[in-house]
Amino acid sequence: HRVRVNALLPAQTETPMIAEQVGEERQRREERIPLGRYAQPSEMASAIAFLGSDDASFITGHALAVDGGYLAFGFRPSVYG
């Protein structure tokens, strides 16, 4: 059947709920992301569109981290209190 199954591992993404984070908490969380910011919804959408496109026709069984380098930098439990 040639079904491809992939997953997106998203980082914190700018949404109305996330936009309510301000001050030191937000700054501390953003500092833990190597790119220094939260993702934009369009960046997540682009990754999803890629995985569903013919450009990704030979990709299956993959979990794509769209996280600004967070996983490469390493999980920091102290960020979450």
Which positions does each model-derived feature cover?
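Short, small/polar-rich loop/turn modules that mediate ligand/substrate recognition or access, typified
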Residues: 2-4, 59-61
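Short, flexible catalytic-loop segment of classical short-chain dehydrogenase/reductase
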Residues: 9-20
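Catalytic "switch" loops of ABC-type ATPases
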Residues: 14, 54-55
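A short C-terminal helix-loop "cap" of Rossmann-like NAD(P)-dependent dehydrogenase/epimerase domains
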Residues: 19-33
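A conserved structural motif in NAD(P)-dependent oxidoreductases
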Residues: 33-44, 55
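Short C-terminal tail/terminal secondary-structure segment
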Residues: 60-81
